Amino acid sequence: MLKNDRWITEQAAAGMLDPFQKGLVRHLDPDQKQAPVLSFGCSSYGYDLRLSPQEFLIFKHVPGTVMNPKRFNPGNLEPTELHHDEDGDYFILPAHSYGLGVALEKMKVPANITVICLGKSTYARLGIIVNTTPAEASWEGHLTLEFSNSSGADCRIYANEGICQLPVSYTHLTLPTKNEV
């Protein structure tokens, strides 16, 4: 079942999203249509999360290395610099590479709700794929977000601006999970 902005706002007041931006922000100065941003905040049937400026990690290329998901080596990740110009704060995700970031908003998912996080079309048009990420019933924390740059060019990934859509749909569960915290 899709949940609307009223429901999302009520749940945010109960701690589901923090910080919470009521309404979708498209410009930092909406009266003058100045300082456009990648939209974030509450929309009619979802919420656009922002990327935290605290840390962004990219996989470094290590010739001869084969990645093993059963023996993940965090040494293959390296932090990247947060840049700033008139367009805002951003990280650079190199062409054909993969990065990890974290959502600015902390989530506290209700016990009878599961949320799916999807990428924004604004980034998809540039070849940036945001991995579909679930936040299961009763989960609490900052979502780790995975990014793949499938294009042949380096790409900016903006911090403090919309990075993914949450939720496109809520799955209203018939019973709370037995793993409820």
What are these regions (language model features)?
Residues 1-173:
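DUTPase catalytic domain/fold
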